[in-house]
């Protein structure tokens, strides 16, 4: 199944049945960058999967059995094993499924990738805050400055020039 055939479940919905053998289920949300990270890995590795979107403003009661805080993304396999948190889910997919490796084999390079991801964590939130401020006609100069600083941190950490794009 592909992302095109998704359904969104909310409060009062019936939980989906068991995950079929040979497929992994992704509990997601259409506009969540963390869930999209997991979707990208599923596609890049060619992993057969189904997507069930969760209404995060009106979460189904049963969903808290999938994630203790009701967050997304969550992976579920046919053995009822659950994996959540996007970075952990992506690493699991890369390790558990054969084919093209997305993470380096070298422990140092793998650690560097994780450190770079840590530096990136503030960027999506600041970007969203800035866009909301602009949409509402509020001044976002301080948010732009903070976002620029995060890009500087990323640039320092990655030893690449990314500010030229911003």
Segments (PLM) and residue ranges:
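GST-like domain detector, emphasizing the conserved glutathione-binding G-site
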Residues: 1-164
């Amino acid at each position: 199944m592909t992302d095109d055939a998704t359904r969104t479940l909310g409060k009062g919905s019936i939980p989906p049945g068991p995950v079929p053998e040979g497929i992994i289920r992704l509990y997601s949300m259409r506009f969540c960058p963390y869930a999209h990270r997991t979707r990208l890995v599923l596609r890049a590795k060619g992993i057969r999967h189904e997507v069930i979107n969760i209404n995060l403003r009106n979460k189904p009661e049963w969903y808290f059995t999938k994630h203790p805080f009701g967050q997304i993304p969550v992976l579920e396999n046919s053995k009822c094993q659950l994996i959540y948190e996007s970075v952990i889910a992506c690493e699991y997919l890369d390790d558990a499924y054969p084919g093209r490796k997305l993470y380096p084999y070298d422990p140092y390079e793998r650690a560097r990738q994780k450190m770079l991801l840590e530096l990136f964590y503030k960027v999506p939130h600041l970007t969203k805050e800035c866009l909301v401020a602009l949409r509402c006609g509020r001044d976002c100069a301080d948010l732009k400055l903070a976002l620029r600083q995060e890009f500087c941190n990323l640039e320092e950490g990655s030893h690449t020039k990314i500010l030229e794009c911003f």
